[in-house]
Each structure stands twice: as C-alpha cells, then as structure tokens.
Amino acid sequence: MMGNQSSLRAYSQRQLRVGELVKQNLGELFIRNEAKIPSINSKLITVTEVRMTPDLKTARVYVIPLGGVDTKETVRILTEYSHLVRKALSKRLDIKFLPKLTFVEDN
C-alpha cells in the first residue's frame, strides 16, 4: 500500500524533463533580462526548481533573489508581471502548451 502512495506523488519523466527545460530557459531569460520586468533586476533572480503539474499546463517556479533579500517582494513582482515572463518564454520554447507560471519563494 505504501508503494502506491509514493508512486502517486512521484513526478513522471515527462514532468521532470519539461520542468528542467522551463527552469533552464527561465534562468537564461532572467540573466538576459528578456522579460523586461519593471522595478526589478532579473539578473539577480535564481530559479531553484520548477515543478510541473501532470497535465503540464501549470509550472510552480521556485525563485530566490541574490542574497535572499526581499524574497516576498520579488515573488509579488514576478507574479504581477508573469504575463511578460510567459511571453518571453514563449519565444524560447517550442512546446504544445506554454504552462501558466506560478512563482513561489524558495526557503
């Protein structure tokens, strides 16, 4: 019984692969400031992890600013301007559905 519960929580290879692809591209996008997010220096943002939902339509993006300062504010700004991040990401990724991005502070 325990094996079934742990396998239900495990991520599929596809989720892991797409999550890693999104993570790499978001990292490059932030370094190059391609999203043009006002009031934030995206070069100072680190994407630590991306977790995809089973349908690959939503990505939970774990971020931390350099030095771990103002994490909540950084997440708030990224959430507010997530449409700009998605637009920039769409130019980099060739996948069927571009996931909705949910930004979360990494502890």
Give a label for each model feature:
Residues M1-T58, I64-N107:
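Charge-rich, low-complexity N-terminal segments
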